[in-house]
Amino acid sequence: MKTNAAERSRYKVADSHRHQSFVGVLRRDPDTYCWTWKGHIDFADGHNFSFASERSFSTKLEAEEYMRRFACNRIDNRLDSSNGGLF
């Protein structure tokens, strides 16, 4: 029998932003029930960037939203700096 979705403690998120893919893994600590995340960005030019949360979150949704914002901001910063700020 499958475990209840509310009891899951690990989720994988795969998405892209500005044609750059990123993957994140959200994990809930079994002792504190707080969520953390780590992930990586695969830039189209072959460079990769790994990242991890430096804090914990009360809910999965809060952790996922923060992780997505972090990845999108990192992608934007790298792409904007590599082309002189032009889209």
Task: Show which residues each predicted segment covers.
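Short beta-strand elements
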Residues: G39-F43
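A short, exposed loop/beta-hairpin motif centered on an aromatic-Gly-Thr core
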Residues: D45-E65, F70
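Short intrinsically disordered terminal tails
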Residues: M1-T3, S81-F87
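Short N-terminal "domain-start" leader segments
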Residues: M1-K38
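Short arginine-rich
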Residues: R69-S81
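Extended hydrophobic/Leu-rich segments
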Residues: T3, Y11-V13, F57, A63-M67, ...
